[in-house]
């Protein structure tokens, strides 16, 4: 199984000729706008969203297109499990029934957090997907799950923003590998130096798209390998 992270052109996805899993961790332009092109050009069976997005204009456009293309819309919340195939399933950890109020509209605070389990030959590899969650959501996850958050690989929240990746959350996840999806020379200052330091403090190996380009993770029965478009010098 291969998982390709971050922004990819539709043409590239088609060229790879392999199955993909698409979900909108939150319906904001930097997370979901590309879904329209995906749905228009690729045969998509299901799209996974969370209920907090229902008031978004972009969400409404995506839903309209899904109905036109007969794409099944799965709205998820904490406690659900989604089986992809005999090897892979996702456990939805967030959001819960009650939406978190972060004073900023709640988009980040209520983004989908999902833990992926890939089991091949009795060996399970786990990846934590975090959307743009920030401190308030991380605190809730730590309170509910504690050490059950542990994962082999972490998709770092909010592009490495200083408002995310708190020490308590990272301690519970304790990832061997961290993936940061971030644009080169971005104006936000992502990833934050404090976030990088906290990851280094727990001996996590960091992969960044601004430094390495496209990141591909391949999980097989023997090992988990990571390839990048730009090689480390």
What are these regions (language model features)?
Residues 1-233:
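Non-globular, low-confidence helical/coil segments that flank catalytic cores
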């Amino acid at each position: 199984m291969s998982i390709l992270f971050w922004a990819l052109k539709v043409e590239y996805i088609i060229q790879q000729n392999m199955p993909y899993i698409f979900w909108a961790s939150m319906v904001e332009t930097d997370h979901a706008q590309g879904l329209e092109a995906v749905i228009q050009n690729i045969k998509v069976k299901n799209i996974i969203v969370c209920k907090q997005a229902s008031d978004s204009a972009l969400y409404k456009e995506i839903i309209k297109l899904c109905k036109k293309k007969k794409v099944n819309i799965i709205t998820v919340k904490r406690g659900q499990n989604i089986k992809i195939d005999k090897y892979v399933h996702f456990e939805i950890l967030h959001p819960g029934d009650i939406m978190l109020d972060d004073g900023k509209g709640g988009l980040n605070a209520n983004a989908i957090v999902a833990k992926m389990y890939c089991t091949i030959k009795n060996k399970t590899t786990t990846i934590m997907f975090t959307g743009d969650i920030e401190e308030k959501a991380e605190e809730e996850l730590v309170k509910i799950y504690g050490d059950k958050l542990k994962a082999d690989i972490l998709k770092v929240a909010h592009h490495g923003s200083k408002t995310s990746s708190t020490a308590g959350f990272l301690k519970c996840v304790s990832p061997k590998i961290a993936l940061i999806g971030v644009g080169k020379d971005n104006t936000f200052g992502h990833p934050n130096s404090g976030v990088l330091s906290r990851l280094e403090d727990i001996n996590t190996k960091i992969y960044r798209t601004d430094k390495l380009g496209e990141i591909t993770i391949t999980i097989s029965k023997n090992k988990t390998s990571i390839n990048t478009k730009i090689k480390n010098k």
